[in-house]
Amino acid sequence: MRILHILDHSLPLHSGYTFRTIAILREQRALGWETFQLTTPRQGACAALEEDVDGWHFYRTPPTPSVVVPGLREWLEMRGNAARILEVARAVKPNILHAHSPVLNALPAIRVGRCLGLPVVYEMRASWEDAAVDHGSTTEGSLRYRASRALETHALRGADQITTICEGLRRDIVGRGIAADKVTVIPNAVDVTAFAAGSPPDEALRRSLGLEGATVLGFIGSFYAYEGLDLLIEALATILQQRPEARLLLVGGGSHEPALRQLAADLGVQDKIIFAGRVPNAQVQRYYDLIDVLAYPRRSMRLTELVTPLKPLEAMAQERLFVASDVGGHRELIRDGETGFLFPAGDAAALARTIARVLDNRAAWPRLRAAGRHFVESERTWARSVARYADVYARALAARRAS
């Protein structure tokens, strides 16, 4: 089996998108399949049309001409993507074209697939229109939103098979009129061997951050508005009334960071919060080891209700204690009171109470940690998830032969 993966971006850029991609490629190689990787102009400027990064060979796509006219820019990008996909496909001769979100990859892949007689699998990791709302480039229900949704639905209809990352997105796809038997969930997972459980804290790092003797709450990830970190800061102000030793460790960065710093100052808790900044991936474990309770207070919106995140799975793999809002993406992953704790989304007071509940129930910590680890080991390994592609590819090949 030879698969050409068409990607928005990949290494050396690090993101949840990249982590999922590399996990898929690694497991597909373990199955004996040959994979080829092509990134689109959203990778950014590249020195050459082919590049080796961390042992992976990537084909790159030249940048799209700079155009500010909405619609024309995307059309030019898709035209450039189609030309490059065709060029690479003719060179590597794949059996399958596997396009991953966004739709700007899917439609060119479908066009090239029809030209070369190749089946196309489209992996919808998030809907393009909801991602645009998240990035602030449109609003739900706007003309651009509706046009983006129509384009996404058109791509879903044109693909031979569809994969997605969770049940929430699967229901959304079927709700667009796509046949249910055309859609397969390939759930997010973790490489449990990559995460240490119960590793001792780095005391030098603890001292450097001023966390000696502290009860540490934490979040590690991107600081976007939908993550609800403002609620976590508000909850900290409440928790400090009963637990003056509490501190909040925020590791990462993002567009919402200035607003978070201002909120901390307004509430008078700026000296109780450590903004550690972005840290190299190889160093992230050291920060995890300092945190007593992780928090994932995502706000409720279409994106968070439909899409499952990776972070809670990583927390379970490390036997971490965590609380999370009860958005749909979290409910699909977390068994309340068993592998983690849920609280009503958007409610800072409930978040504070839930964190206090965890801190006050130390006797249950070993059971919670073991249950989380067991869940990912038994249900959310990448080997288990990626094995599902075998049937997807077989159906795509059969559909193309029958057409």
Model regions: which residues?
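Short hydrophobic beta-strand element within catalytic cores of glycosyltransferases
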Residues: 296, 314-317, 321-324, 334
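Acidic donor-binding loop of glycosyltransferase active sites
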Residues: 92-96, 160, 272, 288-305, ...
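Conserved acidic donor-binding segment of nucleotide-sugar-dependent glycosyltransferases
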Residues: 336-337, 341-348, 357-363
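A short, well-ordered alpha-helix in the C-terminal region of glycosyltransferases
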Residues: 350, 357, 364-379, 388-391
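Nucleotide-activated donor-binding/catalytic signature segment of Leloir-type glycosyltransferases, i.e.
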Residues: 258-285
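Carbohydrate-associated surface elements
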Residues: 168, 189
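N-terminal subdomain of nucleotide-sugar transferases
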Residues: 1-63, 239, 383, 403
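Conserved donor-binding/catalytic core segment of Leloir-type glycosyltransferases
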Residues: 4, 211-236
